[in-house]
């Protein structure tokens, strides 16, 4: 009987064991905190251009370097049970394997990938019920964002030198469609195709949205672009939060809502 009870205790301990996670992917960090599993993170990679939610708790975590250049030595020193990689740190996989450290890369390109990754992280951290709740909240958030569509057309420029837009089958296009904006960027296998001022004029969008490497001064100085409806009516919006808007964690719901409200305010101004 005592042996049986001991086995039960051991099984319970294993099933509720806390992971020691080093997380190099910002979206996974946010998802883990939203699952209530933040205490299982022992190290992260820092970002230089944007914050990671929740910033007050993130600042207390051990850094293993930057997002683009994490340190293998620092990661190993934390004795993680699992390292969650980003697309920028896939080159660490072999080195981690040599030290007997497991790693995982959670690819994410679309909204559906967020739900899949919530489920995976919930299983890893023994937060399955929290995962189901978070997926449900995420789905409801997506549906809510479809309400009161903006009913406009737009081209979202990634940069203006050269002129590069987010293509019509990108995550950004999915975001625009969700809030009722017709994306007039071209269909392309290239995620951010180069386009011409002539193309923009021909499409003549209601709105021009400027992203990470685009600035309004260049557009207003371009004779062709000055003929577009967007510039004539002053419907140009610079989104300084483009990077964080494209981060595929459940926090994207709040970020899209903020983005949508900013575009609505521009229209009403």
Tell where the protein language model's regions lie, with residue ranges:
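A short, structured surface patch at a secondary-structure boundary
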Residues: 20-78, 82-88, 181-184
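Short, solvent-exposed loop/turn elements at domain surfaces
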Residues: 29-34, 49-54, 162-167, 217, ...
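Structured C-terminal subdomain patch of bacterial secreted/periplasmic proteins
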Residues: 20, 24, 115-123, 132, ...
């Amino acid at each position: 009987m005592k042996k049986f009870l001991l086995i039960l205790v051991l099984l319970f301990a294993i099933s509720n064991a806390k992971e020691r996670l080093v997380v190099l992917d910002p979206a996974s960090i946010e998802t883990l905190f939203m699952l209530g599993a933040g205490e299982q993170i022992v190290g992260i990679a820092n970002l230089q251009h944007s914050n990671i939610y929740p910033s007050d708790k993130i600042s207390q975590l051990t850094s293993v370097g930057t997002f683009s250049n994490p340190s293998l030595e620092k990661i190993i020193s934390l004795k993680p049970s699992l390292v969650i990689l980003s697309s920028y740190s896939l080159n660490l996989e072999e080195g981690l394997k040599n030290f007997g450290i497991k790693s995982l890369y959670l690819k994410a390109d679309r909204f559906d990938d967020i739900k899949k990754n919530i489920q995976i992280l919930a299983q890893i951290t023994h937060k399955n019920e929290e995962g189901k709740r978070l997926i449900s909240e995420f789905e409801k958030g997506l549906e809510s964002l479809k309400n009161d569509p903006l009913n406009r057309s737009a081209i979202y420029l990634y940069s203006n030198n050269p002129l590069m837009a987010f293509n019509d089958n990108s995550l950004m296009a999915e975001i625009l469609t969700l809030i009722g904006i017709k994306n007039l960027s071209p269909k392309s296998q290239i995620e951010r195709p180069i386009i011409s001022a002539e193309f923009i004029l021909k499409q003549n969008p209601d709105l021009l949205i400027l992203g990470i490497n685009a600035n309004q001064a260049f557009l207003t100085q371009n004779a062709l672009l000055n003929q577009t409806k967007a510039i004539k009516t002053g419907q140009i919006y610079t989104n300084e939060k483009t990077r964080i808007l494209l981060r595929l964690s459940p926090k994207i719901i709040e970020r899209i809502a903020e983005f949508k409200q900013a575009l609505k305010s521009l229209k009403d101004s």
